[in-house]
UniProtKB/Swiss-Prot annotation:
HAMAP family, sorted: Ribosomal_uS14_1
Biological process according to GO: translation
Pfam families: Ribosomal_S14
Name under which the protein is recorded: Small ribosomal subunit protein uS14
Subunit-structure text: Part of the 30S ribosomal subunit. Contacts proteins S3 and S10.
Function: Binds 16S rRNA, required for the assembly of 30S particles and may also be responsible for determining the conformation of the 16S rRNA at the A site.
Gene3D superfamilies found in the cross-reference section: 1.10.287.1480
Length: 101
């Protein structure tokens, strides 16, 4: 199990990213728009830099929903590989069977 402080930090990042998502997307689109003047694009980049660092969605980490493990997490299930294995063998994940050939 991951430390609670790390899980709380991740939740804080998610909330902050959700709060600034619209503004972040607008500024990002403006700074990447070739039709805009160089001055407008530079101003958009400056505004992006003024946003909180954790407002960037790239800083979020996918974690296992059960254990909080940051690595080896499958997006499809939101679980770490070890938990997928446990739950699959127990028959708790529908449609997953042990490979046999």
């Amino acid at each position: 199990m991951a430390k609670q402080a790390l899980l709380q930090r991740e939740l804080k990042r998610e909330k902050l990213a959700a709060k600034f998502a619209k503004k972040y997307a607008e500024l990002k689109a403006t700074s990447n728009d070739a039709k805009r003047s160089d001055e407008e694009r530079a101003l958009a980049r400056l505004e992006l830099q003024k946003l909180p660092r954790n407002a960037n969605p790239t800083r979020q980490r996918n974690r296992c929903a059960i254990t909080g493990r940051p690595r080896g997490t499958f997006r499809q299930f939101g679980l770490a590989r070890a938990k997928i294995r446990e739950l699959a063998f127990a028959g708790d994940i529908p449609g997953i069977t042990k490979a046999s050939w």
